[in-house]
């Protein structure tokens, strides 16, 4: 199958999801946009040495049966998408990708292969199909979200924590584990709270200098840190939301960005930058490329078409 | 109340639970055995400067109404214990302290104030009383068990882990968090598994170079790593049981000691050293002394007698 | 003596050189600009509680006999400076402070007390006087320049180094030591080169993925990494100049800034951000305030006038 | 040439200097003692799969033209050595290997190829020949001496350093750099002193909680820490001599061992364990094997005979 890889144009995105060294025994033809490897100083020649075709962005879209885009396809590329094309990547069909599904996927009968960690499925003509992609394939990406987000937040806040800095981490999933690993380089004065021990956090939350959130709560769940609780935090407390669950777990919080990563409200500081794995894109690209090559690019991607075949006659 | 502090004689125990700098406004008289601070280079004079009485071991036992012993009182001291004396410390009444309870506590009507993290209670004449001591008072000690145990195990095994070393941590409680924090100094190639994700561990456990256990399972629970599963681990895999739950979570494993910390079985290596917080006694003593001074030694300890008063008429 | 402390207006400067908790037994009157502690969430009230006078910027300049300014006084404040006033801080009289000396210090007969690490002297009417300030008083600031600069550079470059990343550090002084300490959190694949071993670096420099410079060479010294040597570095090599010795040690390199910290040239990346200690201002302020309180603010600063008294009749 | 590799019998030595994965295109025949890879769980079969001959210890000595022994050949093996045999390894001809040179090398006309970092030479019949081995080939071993020695010393002393722990490192060579990298995982409150700044150390040495020595001074040099200076150190100060320069740099200090690593003298603690790289033998073996394969085992070792040929007619 012809798979097209285009340069990321998602704001702040610098990860390169396929590296020449991992291109081995691919049962797919790979079309790569000129300068695809630029962020990692990889020349086009290195991709063509591995049998890839180097084309312009438009040509890649035009000649590919499937487009791999790590992040959501941006509106500026909508006009490239052709009827029946396959899209592989994080598409967040029930989240930030809803408008893409409505405006592009449905009308153009796109075959959307979503790499969501918990339910990697195929979305086609309002139906959901099992994809055969292992669950948690890219779990480490969430780990990196916590890992890189904490480091960036600390530097932007201007503090290297020490054993004197009291640190709470909410959640014990991959994002929280990445945050825990990252901040452990500097301090072991950390306590990780999860469902069973959250009551202890509620009794002690005002003691913390840094509170790191790694939890995405459900729409109807109560926030873990309400407005009033935030008010009783110490002056100067730093809240790092590496789950980027803006406004939910930390009531009233809003997104920040890589260029303006921290805002202050009533003497507390909030870091709610999304897409933080891209901060350490040189590490993450290595891992992504290895996993995607083994699980997506190596085997013929027409296998995903067969999954939706009956509808796709 | 007269509280006696004697030098630790529990094998390998070097923590000093009370430091002169924390002795302020104590509503108790403190009797300290000569050389009590020796492990931390604290002279007897520094204790007497703070109003403590420096006595021989026998005199401390003889003149104290309550004996503080961080670890279980050892048989060699049984003969010192007098009728109705109070014992404060970790006494493990349902675990390793059962024989102490049977042979000493009951017959001598001792008032046993147990500092157990989850249920800090008073045991007196076969009855259990609420102690008023906050739960999780010494939670950080479990954290240190994981923290120090992992570091010691790595050095004994001869490996500083890198990003190439695949590491699994079982559990997300304090012991597991200490282990996670400790090994994060060297690698972020870590995944922490807990109840909800243990099935993923079961599918992947053979990939790991190091498996760290931070879980104490119940008597009737299945082991998390059975004999057969251990057989299919990679040659040279290191299993660090910082919960020191010998024979349970890791089927068939047995205790090791600080002097002989690792044994090999079928090409796998096992570290099951108990009491690992004592490895970094210089850090832990600081924390213990502060917490115990605030929560145990400052207020009059006769408060514990009042808790059991009706029976103690 | 009346000492005035005004908010930093040096680009990117966020350190607060005096904290209320360190104000004890000062033989000087302290005048503080409103909002002086803002970066560290310290209210004006906390300074007035310690006997400081809270004034507007203009009033501080107007009423102070000495102005403490950590960084060079900026042109926008020149008009505030009065004849015979004392300036205490880093004034770089032979470096970036030359124009200040010429335009302000000399004509207004300012008494300039320079806190330079190697030669902390007083400059007054073209004469240089010994200050009595201990050498190396603020050596740790250079350490932090290396420490924070490396961390920021890595995040901007998008890489957390591992044991696979080959790292060279040039120099063994305080800046180089800070860089060494910082990057050691992530990798031990480091070699520090100094005068005696620089020849070994010259034989091996093309093997390195990251080259960190902690050396300020003399005006007439050869660069340590010439244009041609830079050309033969690996594609993607990151050069972090935490000595910010732009154009000297690394031939042809130029300053970058906190907002645009890295530039690429022929596939190599250059980070040459000056004033990096300010990146971790929350840590550095604590240390600065303690040292400055003990060595500058506590004793009567008129002692510096006496040093230049004969001329100042 | 036939090269024999025997199991280490140097006290505490666990490094395995050749791993099967590095055996490629060797121009030498390799004879390996049974169980040679045991410490790293490498079976004899893995060596024979790579063309090695698996023999008893005696057979290896009997059939090899050259014996590779990382550490000094022990007296228990002297009787194996045959006239004219080659010995490759660290032989310390002017240090601990003097008796070996006198009792074995000279009388049996052994060709001793010493892997000393600064002067890798061949010693044959009282003559010294250039070996062609690059200088600093195994420099990283000294780095590991500092790295592992510091970690072991801290654990034996019972302290994980924090930012409150004042740490001095003497020297800026490879051993000192390893120590610096190791302790930087836990604290950045470190200052490295070398020739130019040693005077500053002499003015401040009593402030330090931990003093790490990475310097081997010359026989006639004054100690860096004299008896009297040691007396004025703080009670409980830990002195870690990872240069293991017992009795010289730290006046009066004596060797300790892995089993009894620390002694106390007048309230100060001394760690002077030699051969500390072997503590982390699993890391160091990987590095040693790669470097030795490339620089020693790959090319025909008879090249060393040719270096001494005229004498060896």
Curated annotation (Swiss-Prot), chains A, B, C, D:
| Pfam families reported for this sequence | AlaDh_PNT_C, AlaDh_PNT_N
Q: How does activity depend on temperature?
A: Stable to heating at 50 degrees Celsius for 10 minutes. Rapidly inactivated by heating at 60 degrees Celsius.
Query: How is activity regulated here?
Result: Is potently inhibited by the reaction product N(5)-(L-1-carboxyethyl)-L-ornithine.
Family annotation (Gene3D superfamilies): NAD(P)-binding Rossmann-like Domain
Give the CC-aspect GO terms: plasma membrane
Name the residues that bind NADP(+): 171-176
EC number in record: 1.5.1.24
Name the catalysed reactions: N(5)-[1(S)-1-carboxyethyl]-L-ornithine + NADP(+) + H2O = L-ornithine + pyruvate + NADPH + H(+)
Q: Does the keyword Cell wall biogenesis/degradation apply?
A: no
UniProt keywords, alphabetically: NADP, Oxidoreductase
Q: Give binding positions for pyruvate.
A: 15, 71, 92
Keyword Oxidoreductase present in the record's keywords: the answer is: yes
> Which superkingdom does the taxonomy of this entry point to?
Bacteria
Which GO annotations describe the biological process of this protein? Answer: alanine catabolic process; ornithine metabolic process
Q: Which GO terms describe its molecular function?
A: alanine dehydrogenase activity; N5-(carboxyethyl)ornithine synthase activity
Signal peptide annotation? none
What's the family?
Answer: Belongs to the AlaDH/PNT family. CEOS subfamily.
Subunit arrangement? Homotetramer.
Q: What does the miscellaneous comment read?
A: No enzyme activity is detectable in the reverse direction with NADP(+) and chemically synthesized N(5)-(L-1-carboxyethyl)-L-ornithine as potential substrates.
Q: What does this protein do?
A: Catalyzes the NADPH-dependent reductive condensation between pyruvic acid and the side chain amino group of L-ornithine to form N(5)-(L-1-carboxyethyl)-L-ornithine. To a lesser extent, can also use L-lysine as substrate (yielding N(6)-(L-1-carboxyethyl)-L-lysine). NADH cannot replace NADPH in the condensation reaction.
> What is this protein's record name?
N(5)-(carboxyethyl)ornithine synthase
From which source organism is this entry?
Answer: Lactococcus lactis subsp. lactis (Streptococcus lactis)
**Annotated gene:** ceo
